[in-house]
Amino acid sequence: MFILLILGAMFWIYGRQIILTYGYRASDIPVHLSWINQMSRGKIFSKGVYPFGFHCMIYYLHTVFGVDTYVILCEFFFVQVIYLHAVLLVMLKLLCKTKYLPYIGVFAYIVGDFWSGQTYSRFYSTLPQEYGMIFVIPSVYFLIRFFQIHKENLKDRETRRILQCFAMSFSLTLAIHFYGTMIAGLCCIGIAMGFCFRFVKKEYFCRIMVTGILSVVLAVLPMAIAFAGGTPLQGSLGW
Protein backbone atom coordinates (compact mmCIF):
# COMPACT_ATOMS: atom_id res chain seq x y z
CA MET A 1 0.00 0.00 0.00
CA PHE A 2 2.77 2.46 0.93
CA ILE A 3 4.68 1.60 -2.24
CA LEU A 4 1.56 2.28 -4.32
CA LEU A 5 1.10 5.62 -2.55
CA ILE A 6 4.70 6.62 -3.32
CA LEU A 7 4.42 5.47 -6.94
CA GLY A 8 1.14 7.34 -7.33
CA ALA A 9 2.70 10.55 -6.01
CA MET A 10 5.68 10.16 -8.35
CA PHE A 11 3.49 9.57 -11.38
CA TRP A 12 1.25 12.52 -10.53
CA ILE A 13 4.04 15.02 -9.84
CA TYR A 14 6.68 13.85 -12.31
CA GLY A 15 5.23 11.23 -14.66
CA ARG A 16 2.44 13.35 -16.11
CA GLN A 17 5.05 15.84 -17.36
CA ILE A 18 5.88 13.31 -20.09
CA ILE A 19 2.40 13.96 -21.49
CA LEU A 20 1.92 17.60 -20.53
CA THR A 21 5.35 18.86 -21.60
CA TYR A 22 6.94 16.78 -24.33
CA GLY A 23 10.25 18.50 -24.86
CA TYR A 24 13.28 19.79 -23.05
CA ARG A 25 12.53 21.35 -19.68
CA ALA A 26 15.93 22.98 -19.14
CA SER A 27 17.91 25.32 -21.37
CA ASP A 28 21.20 23.42 -21.06
CA ILE A 29 19.90 20.09 -22.42
CA PRO A 30 20.71 20.98 -26.07
CA VAL A 31 24.33 21.51 -25.00
CA HIS A 32 24.52 18.03 -23.50
CA LEU A 33 22.76 16.65 -26.58
CA SER A 34 25.48 18.15 -28.76
CA TRP A 35 28.24 16.62 -26.63
CA ILE A 36 26.62 13.18 -26.76
CA ASN A 37 26.17 13.42 -30.53
CA GLN A 38 29.85 14.26 -30.86
CA MET A 39 30.65 11.01 -29.02
CA SER A 40 28.90 9.19 -31.88
CA ARG A 41 31.47 10.81 -34.16
CA GLY A 42 34.35 9.64 -31.98
CA LYS A 43 34.91 13.01 -30.31
CA ILE A 44 34.78 12.83 -26.53
CA PHE A 45 35.27 16.09 -24.61
CA SER A 46 34.41 17.95 -27.83
CA LYS A 47 34.00 21.27 -26.00
CA GLY A 48 36.56 20.65 -23.29
CA VAL A 49 37.19 18.34 -20.35
CA TYR A 50 34.03 17.77 -18.34
CA PRO A 51 32.61 14.91 -16.19
CA PHE A 52 31.16 12.64 -18.87
CA GLY A 53 29.64 9.80 -16.82
CA PHE A 54 26.09 10.93 -17.59
CA HIS A 55 26.86 11.44 -21.27
CA CYS A 56 28.43 7.98 -21.54
CA MET A 57 25.28 6.44 -20.07
CA ILE A 58 22.96 8.26 -22.49
CA TYR A 59 25.28 7.41 -25.39
CA TYR A 60 25.19 3.75 -24.34
CA LEU A 61 21.37 3.69 -24.29
CA HIS A 62 21.27 5.34 -27.71
CA THR A 63 23.85 3.01 -29.27
CA VAL A 64 22.71 -0.30 -27.78
CA PHE A 65 18.94 0.15 -27.94
CA GLY A 66 18.75 2.38 -31.00
CA VAL A 67 16.66 5.08 -29.34
CA ASP A 68 17.31 8.60 -30.60
CA THR A 69 19.34 10.63 -28.13
CA TYR A 70 16.92 13.56 -28.14
CA VAL A 71 14.07 11.19 -27.22
CA ILE A 72 16.05 9.76 -24.31
CA LEU A 73 16.78 13.28 -23.06
CA CYS A 74 13.05 14.08 -23.21
CA GLU A 75 11.90 11.03 -21.27
CA PHE A 76 14.74 9.67 -19.14
CA PHE A 77 14.22 12.18 -16.33
CA PHE A 78 11.37 10.03 -14.99
CA VAL A 79 13.65 6.98 -14.80
CA GLN A 80 16.10 9.11 -12.82
CA VAL A 81 13.34 10.16 -10.43
CA ILE A 82 12.23 6.55 -9.87
CA TYR A 83 15.77 5.40 -9.14
CA LEU A 84 16.46 8.36 -6.87
CA HIS A 85 13.45 7.70 -4.67
CA ALA A 86 14.04 3.94 -4.73
CA VAL A 87 17.60 4.42 -3.48
CA LEU A 88 16.38 6.87 -0.83
CA LEU A 89 13.74 4.40 0.36
CA VAL A 90 16.24 1.53 0.54
CA MET A 91 18.71 3.64 2.52
CA LEU A 92 16.05 4.75 5.00
CA LYS A 93 14.81 1.17 5.42
CA LEU A 94 18.35 0.01 6.16
CA LEU A 95 19.05 2.79 8.64
CA CYS A 96 15.68 3.24 10.38
CA LYS A 97 14.38 0.85 13.01
CA THR A 98 10.78 2.01 12.57
CA LYS A 99 8.95 0.08 9.87
CA TYR A 100 6.83 2.88 8.42
CA LEU A 101 9.12 5.89 8.87
CA PRO A 102 11.06 5.31 5.60
CA TYR A 103 7.84 5.33 3.57
CA ILE A 104 6.60 8.47 5.33
CA GLY A 105 9.95 10.17 4.74
CA VAL A 106 10.04 9.39 1.01
CA PHE A 107 6.39 10.38 0.54
CA ALA A 108 6.97 13.67 2.37
CA TYR A 109 10.00 14.33 0.17
CA ILE A 110 7.98 13.75 -3.00
CA VAL A 111 4.97 15.89 -2.08
CA GLY A 112 7.28 18.67 -0.90
CA ASP A 113 7.15 19.73 -4.54
CA PHE A 114 3.73 21.27 -3.86
CA TRP A 115 5.21 23.78 -1.40
CA SER A 116 8.59 24.41 -2.99
CA GLY A 117 8.31 23.70 -6.69
CA GLN A 118 11.44 25.65 -7.64
CA THR A 119 13.55 23.41 -5.41
CA TYR A 120 12.44 20.36 -7.39
CA SER A 121 12.16 21.97 -10.84
CA ARG A 122 15.33 20.55 -12.36
CA PHE A 123 14.27 17.00 -11.52
CA TYR A 124 11.76 17.41 -14.34
CA SER A 125 14.70 17.36 -16.76
CA THR A 126 17.29 14.78 -17.81
CA LEU A 127 20.42 16.46 -16.47
CA PRO A 128 23.82 15.28 -15.16
CA GLN A 129 23.60 16.85 -11.72
CA GLU A 130 20.19 15.37 -10.99
CA TYR A 131 21.28 11.98 -12.34
CA GLY A 132 24.33 12.09 -10.06
CA MET A 133 22.11 12.46 -6.99
CA ILE A 134 21.28 8.77 -7.34
CA PHE A 135 24.83 7.95 -6.23
CA VAL A 136 25.12 10.53 -3.46
CA ILE A 137 22.73 8.54 -1.28
CA PRO A 138 24.69 5.23 -1.47
CA SER A 139 27.87 7.18 -0.63
CA VAL A 140 26.23 8.38 2.57
CA TYR A 141 24.85 4.96 3.46
CA PHE A 142 28.05 2.96 2.94
CA LEU A 143 30.13 5.46 4.90
CA ILE A 144 27.73 5.19 7.84
CA ARG A 145 27.84 1.40 7.57
CA PHE A 146 31.63 1.46 7.62
CA PHE A 147 31.80 3.48 10.83
CA GLN A 148 29.22 1.19 12.43
CA ILE A 149 31.57 -1.78 12.07
CA HIS A 150 33.35 -2.78 15.26
CA LYS A 151 37.13 -2.62 15.31
CA GLU A 152 37.58 -6.38 15.55
CA ASN A 153 35.56 -6.88 12.35
CA LEU A 154 37.43 -4.39 10.15
CA LYS A 155 39.37 -7.14 8.39
CA ASP A 156 36.25 -9.07 7.40
CA ARG A 157 35.17 -9.49 3.79
CA GLU A 158 32.01 -7.49 4.49
CA THR A 159 34.11 -4.45 5.41
CA ARG A 160 35.99 -4.66 2.11
CA ARG A 161 32.71 -4.87 0.21
CA ILE A 162 31.31 -1.85 2.05
CA LEU A 163 34.43 0.17 1.25
CA GLN A 164 34.31 -0.95 -2.38
CA CYS A 165 30.67 0.12 -2.65
CA PHE A 166 31.49 3.46 -1.05
CA ALA A 167 34.38 3.98 -3.47
CA MET A 168 32.20 3.19 -6.50
CA SER A 169 29.36 5.43 -5.33
CA PHE A 170 31.57 8.40 -4.49
CA SER A 171 33.58 7.96 -7.68
CA LEU A 172 30.40 7.97 -9.77
CA THR A 173 29.28 11.28 -8.26
CA LEU A 174 32.56 12.80 -9.44
CA ALA A 175 32.41 11.13 -12.85
CA ILE A 176 28.92 12.56 -13.42
CA HIS A 177 28.90 16.07 -11.91
CA PHE A 178 31.08 17.98 -9.45
CA TYR A 179 28.09 19.44 -7.61
CA GLY A 180 26.94 15.98 -6.60
CA THR A 181 30.43 15.30 -5.27
CA MET A 182 30.31 18.49 -3.23
CA ILE A 183 27.04 17.39 -1.63
CA ALA A 184 28.41 13.90 -0.98
CA GLY A 185 31.61 15.41 0.42
CA LEU A 186 29.72 17.64 2.84
CA CYS A 187 27.65 14.66 3.98
CA CYS A 188 30.82 12.62 4.47
CA ILE A 189 32.36 15.38 6.58
CA GLY A 190 29.24 15.46 8.75
CA ILE A 191 29.31 11.67 9.15
CA ALA A 192 33.01 11.72 10.04
CA MET A 193 32.29 14.36 12.70
CA GLY A 194 29.44 12.25 14.05
CA PHE A 195 31.76 9.25 14.30
CA CYS A 196 34.78 11.39 15.23
CA PHE A 197 36.02 9.03 17.95
CA ARG A 198 36.27 6.22 15.42
CA PHE A 199 37.35 8.42 12.51
CA VAL A 200 40.55 9.52 14.25
CA LYS A 201 41.57 5.95 15.04
CA LYS A 202 44.25 4.63 12.71
CA GLU A 203 42.30 1.50 11.75
CA TYR A 204 39.35 3.54 10.48
CA PHE A 205 41.18 6.64 9.27
CA CYS A 206 43.66 4.86 7.00
CA ARG A 207 41.04 2.64 5.40
CA ILE A 208 38.59 5.41 4.60
CA MET A 209 41.25 7.85 3.39
CA VAL A 210 42.81 5.32 1.02
CA THR A 211 39.35 4.38 -0.24
CA GLY A 212 38.42 8.03 -0.75
CA ILE A 213 41.63 8.84 -2.62
CA LEU A 214 41.23 5.82 -4.91
CA SER A 215 37.63 6.75 -5.67
CA VAL A 216 38.68 10.26 -6.70
CA VAL A 217 41.55 8.95 -8.84
CA LEU A 218 39.21 6.56 -10.68
CA ALA A 219 36.87 9.40 -11.63
CA VAL A 220 39.50 12.03 -12.42
CA LEU A 221 41.93 9.82 -14.37
CA PRO A 222 40.13 9.96 -17.78
CA MET A 223 39.75 13.73 -17.48
CA ALA A 224 43.36 14.16 -16.35
CA ILE A 225 44.64 12.13 -19.30
CA ALA A 226 42.58 14.22 -21.73
CA PHE A 227 43.79 17.46 -20.14
CA ALA A 228 47.40 16.29 -20.22
CA GLY A 229 46.91 15.47 -23.90
CA GLY A 230 46.06 19.08 -24.68
CA THR A 231 42.26 19.18 -24.32
CA PRO A 232 41.29 22.35 -22.43
CA LEU A 233 38.87 22.40 -19.52
CA GLN A 234 35.23 23.07 -20.33
CA GLY A 235 34.30 26.62 -19.41
CA SER A 236 31.62 25.80 -16.83
CA LEU A 237 34.18 24.12 -14.57
CA GLY A 238 35.20 27.60 -13.52
CA TRP A 239 31.81 28.15 -11.91
Range-by-range predicted roles:
Residues 1-239:
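Membrane-embedded transmembrane-helix bundle of lipid-linked glycan/lipid transferases
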